[in-house]
Curated annotation (Swiss-Prot):
Residues 253-255 are annotated as: GPR motif. The keyword Cell wall biogenesis/degradation does not apply. It comes from Rotavirus A (isolate RVA/Human/Australia/A91a/1991/G1P[X]). N-glycosylated. InterPro entries: VP7 (IPR001963), VP7_1 (IPR042207), VP7_2 (IPR042210). This is Outer capsid glycoprotein VP7.
Length: 326
C-alpha cells in the first residue's frame, strides 16, 4: 500500500519536474523567435528607410504605388533624382567636372551628394526605344526640334503615363481597340506598321487581307509609334517583325514620378489634347535658354518647386513595364 503511494507521489513529482523543463524550453524557444523576429524587423526597417541608389530592378507590369508628396519633411534624405539629358548638353559644356559642380549646387537645395544621378542619352528617337526611369523622381530634358515634334510628343505620352500591355500575335489573331485608352505601342530600331480594317465577314475594308501592299500604313520607319485606329473594328496587322515589337496597351493614368522639361521652342508641347489624358494636366515645363549651363542652373533653382507637383513611386520602370502584364 505504501509502495503504491510512494510510486504515485514519485510519478507526480517527476511529472512536475518534466512539465517545468518543457515550459522553460518552450519559453526559451519563444524568446529566440521573438528576438530574432525583432532583429529582422529592425534590419528591414533600416533598409527600407535607407537611400535608394537607383538599382536596375527587373520590374514588369504597372505596379506603382503612390507615396506621400514631396512636401513631406525630409523627403530628399530618402529619395533619388535622375536627370536625363541629351549628349548635346555635355558636348557644349565640355567640362569633365560639370556633374560634380551641379551636385554641389543641388546640395544647397537639400539634395545630398549621391542622391542626384545624371544620365545621358544620344537623342530623343533612340531614348524612346528603351526608356529606363529608375529613380524616385525622374526629370527628362528634351531639346525642342521642329522636325522631331511628333516624336517628342509620343515619348512624352509614353513616359508621363502608366501603360498596361500584352504581347500581340498577329499571325493567329485579328485585333481591335476597345476604347480611347486602348492603343498599340510599337518599339524597335525601325517600325513600319500597316493595318487592314475588316468588316463582319472578315473581308478587308478598302484593302485586301492577302495583299499587304494594300494595307493602310500608320507608322513608317519609326522607333516609337503609338497607333490609334477606329474602336470596335477588327484589324489585320502587319509590321516589321525583325526590327520591331508591338503590344496591345491600355493607358491607366498619369505616372507622377516623371516630368518633362522642354528646352526651347515657342510653346510647350501639349499632350492634354489627347482625350485619353485624364485628368487634363501634365508635368511638362519649358525653359528657353541657348546655353545648357543656363538650363541646368534654372533646373537647380526650381528643382523643389518641380518636385512638389510630382509624387514619389515605389517601383523602378523600364521598357519591360510597357510590355508584359503581371
Amino acid at each position: 500500500m505504501y509502495g503504491i503511494e510512494y510510486t504515485t507521489i514519485l510519478i507526480f513529482l517527476i511529472s512536475i519536474i518534466l512539465l517545468n523543463y518543457i515550459l522553460k524550453s518552450v519559453t526559451r524557444i519563444m524568446d529566440y523567435i521573438i528576438y530574432r523576429s525583432l532583429l529582422i524587423y529592425v534590419a528591414l526597417f533600416a533598409l527600407t528607410r535607407a537611400q535608394n541608389y537607383g538599382l536596375n530592378l527587373p520590374i514588369t507590369g504597372s505596379m506603382d504605388t503612390v507615396y506621400a508628396n514631396s512636401t513631406q519633411e525630409g523627403i530628399f534624405l530618402t529619395s533619388t533624382l535622375c536627370l536625363y539629358y541629351p549628349t548635346e548638353a555635355s558636348t557644349q559644356i565640355n567640362d569633365g567636372e560639370w556633374k560634380d559642380s551641379l551636385s554641389q549646387m543641388f546640395l544647397t537645395k537639400g539634395w545630398p551628394t549621391g542622391s542626384v544621378y545624371f544620365k545621358e542619352y544620344s537623342n530623343i528617337v533612340d531614348f524612346s526605344v528603351d526608356p529606363q526611369l529608375y529613380c524616385d523622381y525622374n526629370l527628362v530634358l528634351m531639346k525642342y526640334d521642329q522636325n522631331l515634334e511628333l516624336d517628342m510628343s509620343e515619348l512624352a505620352d509614353l513616359i508621363l503615363n502608366e501603360w498596361l500591355c500584352n504581347p500581340m500575335d498577329i499571325t493567329l489573331y485579328y485585333y481591335q481597340q476597345s476604347g480611347e485608352s486602348n492603343k498599340w505601342i510599337s518599339m524597335g530600331s525601325s517600325c513600319t506598321v500597316k493595318v487592314c480594317p475588316l468588316n463582319t465577314q472578315t473581308l478587308g475594308i478598302g484593302c485586301q487581307t492577302t495583299n499587304v501592299d494594300s494595307f493602310e500604313m500608320v507608322a513608317e520607319n519609326e522607333k516609337l509609334a503609338i497607333v490609334d485606329v477606329v474602336d470596335g473594328i477588327n484589324h489585320k496587322i502587319n509590321f516589321t517583325t525583325t526590327t520591331c515589337t508591338i503590344r496591345n496597351c491600355k493607358k491607366l493614368g498619369p505616372r507622377e514620378n516623371v516630368a518633362v522639361i522642354q528646352v526651347g521652342g515657342s510653346n510647350v508641347l501639349d499632350i492634354t489634347a489627347d482625350p485619353t489624358t485624364n485628368p487634363q494636366t501634365e508635368r511638362m515645363m519649358r525653359v528657353n535658354w541657348k546655353k545648357w549651363w543656363q538650363v541646368f542652373y534654372t533646373i537647380v533653382d526650381y528643382i523643389n518647386q518641380i518636385i512638389q507637383v510630382m509624387s514619389k513611386r515605389s517601383r523602378s520602370l523600364n521598357s519591360a513595364a510597357f510590355y508584359y502584364r503581371v
